[in-house]
């Protein structure tokens, strides 16, 4: 797969600690994540696969594009949602009318929730040792 991608044809999505760079290539609807087939990478979880394909399905473009993603960081849930956001952003970049379709479904919303840092003196971010009054 020695395809050269143009810089303006890239969609970037983030969720939790995961960052995805997404490319849409004219094709048959296959998903490739980190040079591995999407089914294998996502452990054959249909929920993850359907989530990635959802923006394309809303626009009836499922079998017209192959999704190629490079993802770093996070777990499978964060990576899946970051790819989904990247696909939606790239579809809007390709054609502005797609934004009007995808926006009501929440595909263009970045989920800003990230892990809270651990504070000193506590066991976790908020968990403290049991308080004894006497």
UniProtKB/Swiss-Prot annotation:
One of its GO terms (molecular function) is RNA binding. It holds the Pfam family Ribosomal_S9. One of its GO terms (biological process) is translation. GO terms for cellular component: chloroplast; small ribosomal subunit. Keywords: Chloroplast, Plastid, Ribonucleoprotein, Ribosomal protein. It is found in: Plastid, Chloroplast. The keyword Plastid applies. SUPFAM superfamilies: Ribosomal protein S5 domain 2-like. InterPro entries: Ribosomal_Su5_D2-typ_SF, Ribosomal_uS9, Ribosomal_uS9_bac/plastid, Ribosomal_uS9_CS, Ribsml_uS5_D2-typ_fold_subgr. Its main location: plastid. Belongs to the universal ribosomal protein uS9 family. This is Small ribosomal subunit protein uS9c. The gene is rps9.
């Amino acid at each position: 797969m020695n395809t050269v991608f143009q810089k303006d044809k890239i969609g970037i999505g983030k969720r939790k600690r995961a960052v995805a760079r997404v490319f849409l290539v004219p094709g048959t609807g296959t998903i490739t994540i980190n040079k591995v087939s999407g089914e294998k990478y996502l452990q054959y979880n249909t929920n993850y696969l359907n989530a990635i394909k959802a923006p394309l399905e809303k626009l009836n473009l499922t079998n017209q594009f192959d999704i190629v993603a490079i993802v770093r960081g996070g777990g499978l849930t964060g990576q899946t949602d970051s790819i989904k956001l990247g696909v939606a952003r790239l579809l809007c970049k390709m054609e502005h009318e797609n934004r009007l379709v995808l926006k009501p479904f929440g595909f263009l919303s970045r989920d800003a929730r990230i892990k809270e840092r651990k504070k000193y003196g506590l066991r976790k971010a908020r968990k403290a040792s049991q308080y004894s009054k006497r």
